[in-house]
Every structure is written in C-alpha cells, then in structure tokens.
Amino acid sequence: MAAKTYDAGVKDYRSIYWEPQYQVKDSDILAVFKVVPQPGVSREEAAAAVAAESSTATWTTVWTDLLTDLDYYKGRAYAIEDVPGSDEAFYAFIAYPMDLFEEGSVVNVFTSLVGNVFGFKAVRALRLEDVRFPLWFVMTCPGAPHGMKVERDLLDKYGRPLLGCTIKPKLGLAAKNYGRAVYECLRGGLDFTKDDENVNSQPFLRWRDRFLFCQEAIQKAEAETGERKGHYMNVTAGTMEEIYERAEFAKEIGTPIIMSDYLTVGWAAHTSLSRWCRKNGMLLHVHRAMHAVMDRNPNHGINFRVLAKILRLMGGDHLHSGTVVGKLEGDREATIGWINLLRDRFIKADRSRGIFFDQDWGPQPGLFPVASGGIHVWHMPALVSIFGNDSVLQFGGGTLGHPWGNAAGACANRVALEACVQARNEGRHLEKEGKEILTKAAQSSPELRMAMETWKEIKFEFDTVDKLDVQHR
C-alpha cells in the first residue's frame, strides 16, 4: 500500500520558497530547523513549506498577493543537510528578510518562526535548532540591564565564580523562618540566596513579608561579614501591574537584585521588566522554569540555545543554563555552547557545541550563566572547570542539607570554591585532582569535611535526553 501523501492544505511551495542558489545577506535573520516530514513529502517541499508558513504564505493563492512584492518579503529555504544518526529528520536552513519583522520585538520574530508552522500538516515534527540574529536586530533589543562587569563592580567581587543558594523547602516556609534561612546562608559565606521559581505570593508567604524579612537578613549578614550580599526576590506575578509593584517595593527597601521567570511570565512582560531594571539600577536574575517543555524533546520544540539567545536579547543579568553534573538535563558540550552564547561578544559557528551560525552581539554586555540543580561540594572542581570565573554556582540542597545547618553548608561551599580557584590558578587540573584538592582543604575546615562525608555517595546516573547530534562529537 502506498504511503499517504498529505495533499490537503499543502500547495507546491517548492517552486517558490526553495532557493538553493540564494546568497544569504548580513541583514537576514537565519534559522535552522530539524524537520521530520510526513510520509510522501519530499525534503525540499517540507523545507519550503516551513519557510512559507513561517513567513508570507497561506494555503492557497489569494488575489492580494498581487498588491505586494512577495518575492521580497518571503522566507527562503536555501540549504538542506542530513541529521547524523537519523533516517527521517533533516536540517532545513531558512533566511528571512529584515523587513519581515518589527525592530526590537522578540515576540514578533517568534510569532512567525514558531507560530502556526509547528502545527502544519506537511511536517510530522519540527524543532528550531538555532537562529542567527543580525546586528541590526540585536542593536534594537534592550539586552542585559547591566551585565557581568557592572555587577562585579557593584559587589566588589572579582576573580572567582559567585556563590548562591536556593532556599528550601521551596514552598511552605513562613516569612520569618524564610528570612532566617537566608541570613544563615549569607553569613556562612554565600554571595546570594534565591527565591525558587514558584515562590510568588502564596497564603503562607506573602511577597511583602518575604521581601522585608529577606532584606533584614541581607543587611545583618553584610554588617557581620563586611561583604555585599543579596537575595533574588522573585517579582513574578499574574499581571504586569503586580510585577511593577513588587519591583518598586524591592527597590524602595534597598535590595540590589530581583528575579523573573521569563518563560512563564511572558516575553513581553519580561522585556518590560528588564527595561525597568536598567532604568532603576536593579540587577535581574532570570529563571528558565518551563524550558524543558519546549527544549527537551530532541525532535520537536525549540532548542535551549535559541531560548538563551532570546533571553540575551530581552535582557537579564543571570540565566540558569544547566550544570552538566547535577540532577537536571544538560549535555556537556551543548551546555558549554550555551555558556559561550550568554557571555561572549562574538561566537563562531561550532557544530561540536551545537552552534550553527556565527553570532555577533555587538556592544551588548554578557550575562552570568547559572549552574543550579542537584549540585554539592563534590561537584565544585568540575563546576569551576566548566563554568570558569564568570558564573554563578548555586547550591540549594547542597547548602541547606548540611547536617550542621545552613551556615555550615554555606561555609563548606565557600571553602571548596576558594580551594578550587586557588588550585586552578596554580595550574592544577581540577577534574582530575578534585578529590585531592577538596580533601586537603577539608583538613582545616570541619564544615567541608562533614559536607564531603554527607554527599560522597550522591550521584545522578540518568543520561541526558537531548544530546548533540552524533556526527559533531
């Protein structure tokens, strides 16, 4: 029996939108999709259909086509490549002209690129793997409110990763107990503590009470340690008016940094908050809650490298980027690629890290990648090696789970971090010599010694689901 061809709703896009001879322009927005076509649909037709449905086309010819220059405005599928290890999927490279999009609007770009086309019958699965944003578009977007250099100057902390902790349990603590947990962590040696992504303003922990107790903890810890401290106060809320109210209150009481869940709050709302942070001198920590809904399926959705680029355009000073070694999803080479996309000014295409296009960020400042999720002191050598200085290493259970309490857990992490940074600066190989480095440091730190004993058997053995395609290893 012949394979079914999906004719309904599909016109001959190949003759119009497939242009293998097209020479891409510096001003084009470029995208690469992983496409699994329906049976009976050729690669060229499927690629052209994606280009058409994500730009100018509808399912049939309409008379108003004659009132514009469709050849100027259309997206063009200009190349096709095999996906290593797959007999069904292929990469489709598509170029979009600059006038197809509103300047500075990530929302507008992705309404086209990942809009109706993802439900199109000609394709069985579709994944946006990478996007090249030309400099003209980058320069019209807000970017990071402040960036890494400004934050280091504000904190007066240089030469090492910043150290943080997510307060646990993530839900259920009353405001006074929550503030006490923050204080213990900060006085123990952490730079920051953090609200978890789903801490907003629940009945047991109203946002105003949380902010006040956390700010009291910050001020007390700063007075005792002589260091600048902070707590990422999550201002995410159900309306933009509530978000601004919470942000204004955080500014009023003197906190240096607030937090947003950029995917669940919405891209327009997050961009507005980012602009507010720049105007008001507030740092912005960004959580990626909901990302795995879009990026974990290797055949359908949006790769996290695209979501990371979106955030860099919209604005944030920190973004969670995976850990490689913790409990959450994160292929090593792919994660290093994401880290580079967040921090560096210019990134060369590098298929070994999953990066399909050169990306020039111009003068936009880089932001701190955040490692968080199931990490503890035994992971410190690998984290310092993978992430380098310009990063935030965030230990939740790996701080608060210390048998001697939060302050001891924070102290253990700080001692481990400084030992690893010193060893690295001496030229030692952290991932090969990590155990020896930590063991020596623990000789003068009972807190670290107890942390190492507590978590020596803890491992997360599950493999990564979303891996880089095998050919590029």
From Swiss-Prot:
Mg(2+) binds at residues 194, 196-197. Binds 1 Mg(2+) ion per subunit. Its EC number is 4.1.1.39. Substrate binds at residues 116, 166, 170, 288, 320, 372. The record marks 327 as: Transition state stabilizer. GO terms for molecular function: magnesium ion binding; monooxygenase activity; ribulose-bisphosphate carboxylase activity. RuBisCO catalyzes two reactions: the carboxylation of D-ribulose 1,5-bisphosphate, the primary event in carbon dioxide fixation, as well as the oxidative fragmentation of the pentose substrate. Both reactions occur simultaneously and in competition at the same active site. Heterohexadecamer of 8 large chains and 8 small chains. This is Ribulose bisphosphate carboxylase large chain. It comes from Rhodobacter capsulatus (strain ATCC BAA-309 / NBRC 16581 / SB1003). The lineage of its organism: Bacteria, Pseudomonadati, Pseudomonadota, Alphaproteobacteria, Rhodobacterales.
